[in-house]
Every structure is written in structure tokens, then in C-alpha cells.
Amino acid sequence: VTSHGRACAIMNPYYAVFFAPAIEDKLRLVGGIFRRYGYITEDLDALSGRELGIVVAEGMTNLSRKIGFPTRLSELPGFTDEHVSRALGAAKNPQLESKLQNMPVPLVASQVDEYMGPILEAARSGDFSLIVNM
């Protein structure tokens, strides 16, 4: 449906919301860049956790929209429910367990549907409110 890099660029804002409580310093850094160039207007120092993640994610999607880049998986021609199912199945593959464990918010395979499922649904629709934080 799309290249790995393109998929990562679409997914980054959604994972920023999920990981936000664990990566606040990084979000403030990158958020400052988005703010400097007008993609974020909020005072990042007044925000924390999920709220900070949502504001930075909105800055990311504002930039993407400005350059005509997709911000939702549903904007990719040919994207279907099967792609979500395959992604969730791949994330639960025991051979990839170390990838789950090395994320800013470590997961185990039994948590994939509970946490990654809503991230993918949010990325399909563009609705950050669907993301469930740990």
C-alpha cells in the first residue's frame, strides 16, 4: 500500500500521543521546532503527558497537510481492515518481542490489541482521542 518510510511518517503523530508520558523531553524538543515555524501555537511548557503529545502530534499533522502529505491511513489508496489485522498479527509475532520491549512504553504481545489496536484505528481515522495510554 505504501513504503515503510511513508507509513512511519503517517504513524509518528499517533505513536507520539501514545508514548507521550514517557517521552516528554523529546516532545518538547521537537515541539519547539514545530512551534518556531508556526505549526504549533500552544505553550508547550504548560503541557504534559498526553496533552503535550496531542499538541505535538497536531503540529506534525499540520506540517504534513501543508506539504500535501497524508495524515491518516485511510488516505492511502488500497488501505483496508486487512492491513490493520496484519499489522497487529505481526506485532504479536514472538520473534519480534524485543521490538515491543524496546519501545518507550514497553509492551508484551498480549497487550498489542488493547494498545496498538486503538493507535491503528486512530491513524486510520485521524482521531487522536481513540488512543489509549498506559
Name the predicted role of every residue range.
Residues 1-59:
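Active-site segments that bind and position negatively charged phosphate/pyrophosphate groups
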